[in-house]
């Protein structure tokens, strides 16, 4: 069964490359058997990024004579956001087609058309759907098998609603998969187009059992948020599945660039309102990140008396609350007195805004749990130090990547609030643990209000103010050259891109 799931994932890997950089894929395949060391390095770097653009350096081309087109291959070359917005304003009936998360925008004469994913990528989605059905026939879990069949149908229609409901309803499955176009990280033009991502997962029952404390209080944290009552959805944030998984195979959006250690899905606000979301924590990826990246960076950049505070348990708690917090806050924006999609309202900067909201509301939630006596207040130093060490790791990506954009903004805000200070003599950073809760609460209020109002201008101005890498931090990060930027997963299943 796992082999069939991986086979389906390899088909979606082939689709992701065509969403990201079809020309880069041609070069990747051409270099596959080249013996030269330079060719091998280029081949491997193409694999890391799923394109000829460095996803962690603002899509900077790393191949000669290449130019990055915003939105990757999801839009026509040379198109601008203004051109799309002007076209839709003149042709309002085309808005749903052009702005759909599941269409590739193309030119047709003087018009713009949205080609459905299931049409554009049909030659890979058909075999992927077959492999999912084959896997379903091999599963002894009836609910999981039913989900796989529904997801196979969804691949061929771009309608994921029914299969998403079935996925959220899975009860402690031994095996699970993420298998859909969910995230919009490739779309830095409109911020609405999704890319395919896959994770084949095996449940870690012991670690999953530890999540019960967090699950119990999700609704209470939602009620406690610094947000007007009418902007708090009635069901979003209520207890939903939370699983710790090991992922022996990932592809597509989950394979290239930033290596996620957790996910909170689906992103469909209808599912949020009806069911909530499922939170997945990739234990094998988290272990690698913390041990090989986060802890070493903390020891280099944090003041010596705080450098040993970040921990695996602290980082896990921060990540758990981050993923829970993706499902907290407003499900829609209020724009001109009407309900509007938050992604569409905020635009391309939405991904960074949402990652920041999840970070900060997550810390706010940890404060709430400590203040209510659910978690010991003695853990506060551990939680804050683990998050700040994580910031240092993330901003090494450059501030164009969504998570890095979010955490660069957080860092600068905390510095402004004196919750983080720098020792000019040593160049190391320290946390003022007395000031951090207030800074977290005020930032949570700002980010939640931006999402609730759908105020794109306010969002862009906020990130412009706080989104620049300070020179002193850039200098400090130069000392971390021997620490990996991220983990580079190696799978025994192979890539097998077609």
Segment roles from a protein language model:
Residues 4, 87-352, 356-368, 373-391, ...:
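Fold-level signature of zinc-dependent metallopeptidase catalytic domains
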Residues 444-498:
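Extended, compositionally biased alpha-helical segments that mediate assembly or anchoring
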């Amino acid at each position: 069964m796992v082999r069939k799931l991986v086979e389906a994932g390899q088909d979606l890997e082939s689709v992701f490359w065509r969403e990201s950089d079809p020309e880069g894929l041609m070069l990747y395949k051409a270099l596959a058997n080249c013996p030269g060391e330079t060719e091998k390095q280029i081949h491997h770097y193409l694999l890391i990024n799923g394109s000829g653009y460095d996803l962690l350096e603002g899509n900077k081309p790393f191949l000669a004579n290449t130019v990055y087109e915003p939105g990757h291959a999801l839009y026509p070359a040379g198109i601008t956001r203004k051109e799309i917005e002007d076209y839709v304003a003149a042709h309002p009936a085309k808005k749903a087609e052009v702005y759909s998360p599941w269409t590739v925008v193309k030119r047709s004469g003087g018009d713009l058309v949205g080609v459905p994913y299931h049409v554009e990528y049909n030659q890979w989605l058909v075999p992927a759907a077959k492999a999912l059905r084959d896997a379903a026939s091999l599963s002894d879990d009836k609910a999981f098998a039913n989900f796989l069949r529904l997801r196979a149908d969804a691949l061929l229609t771009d309608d994921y609603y029914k299969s998403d409901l079935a996925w959220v309803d899975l009860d402690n499955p031994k095996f699970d998969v993420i298998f859909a176009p969910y995230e919009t990280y490739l779309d830095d033009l409109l911020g609405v187009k999704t890319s395919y991502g896959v994770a084949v997962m095996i449940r870690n029952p012991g670690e999953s059992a530890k999540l019960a404390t967090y699950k119990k209080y999700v609704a209470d944290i939602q009620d406690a948020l610094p947000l007007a009552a009418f902007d708090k959805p009635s069901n979003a944030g209520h207890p939903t599945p939370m699983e710790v998984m090991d992922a022996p195979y990932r592809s597509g959006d989950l394979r290239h660039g930033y290596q996620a250690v957790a996910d909170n899905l689906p992103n469909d606000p209808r599912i949020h309102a009806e069911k909530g979301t499922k939170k997945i924590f990739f234990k094998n990826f988290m272990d690698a990140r913390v041990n090989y990246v986060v802890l070493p960076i903390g020891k280099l950049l944090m003041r010596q008396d705080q450098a040993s505070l970040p921990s695996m348990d602290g980082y896990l708690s921060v990540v758990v609350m981050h993923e829970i917090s993706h499902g907290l806050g407003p499900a829609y924006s209020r724009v001109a007195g009407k309900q509007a999609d938050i992604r569409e309202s905020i635009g391309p900067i939405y991904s960074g805004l949402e990652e920041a909201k999840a970070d900060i509301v997550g810390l706010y939630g940890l404060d709430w749990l400590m203040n209510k006596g659910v978690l010991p207040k003695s853990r506060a130093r551990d939680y804050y130090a683990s998050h700040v060490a994580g910031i240092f790791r993330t901003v090494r990506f450059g501030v164009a990547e969504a998570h890095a954009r979010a955490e660069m903004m957080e860092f600068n805000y905390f510095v402004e609030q004196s919750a983080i200070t720098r020792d000019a003599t040593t160049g190391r950073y320290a946390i003022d643990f007395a000031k951090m809760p207030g800074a977290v609460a005020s930032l949570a209020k700002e980010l939640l209000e931006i999402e609730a109002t759908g105020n794109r201008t306010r969002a862009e101005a906020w990130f412009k103010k706080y989104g620049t890498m300070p020179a002193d931090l850039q200098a400090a990060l130069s000392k971390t050259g021997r620490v990996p930027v991220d983990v580079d997963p190696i799978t025994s299943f192979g890539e097998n891109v077609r």
